[in-house]
């Protein structure tokens, strides 16, 4: 019975504090840094580098952003780029995948992820607008094929590091991009 209580106490300690036993302000700093990296990845990598080809990133930097976006958003580079390019090509028309003019600002702000998912299934959009995006082995066999497993892994990481409060950290990370 001693082993049971030892395991019980270890589980309670982990749920209470995670492996880092971080203070509340350290958890807040982590969440802010992680969400900032996600915003930078969307802005620098997806938007400037991939969608508009306005910036050439070193392959290591590009791959870091691809990996980070897989962990924190589940977004597939080709899909995001194709949808964004179509948005510019069909701006504020009924063909714009996320126009606040035709769909309403509330819809775009509150269900932007659903609009993204729906448009990502339109093969014509992917073919016409998704060119010149990564198409290597890891993109096809991990980042695209298992796009949502990345965010699942991020949940496991957050729970491991911070215990039960890691679920709140993860929820913030998942909500951050659709909100901002």
Feature names for model-found ranges:
Residues 1-180:
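Non-catalytic, topology-defining segments of multipass membrane proteins
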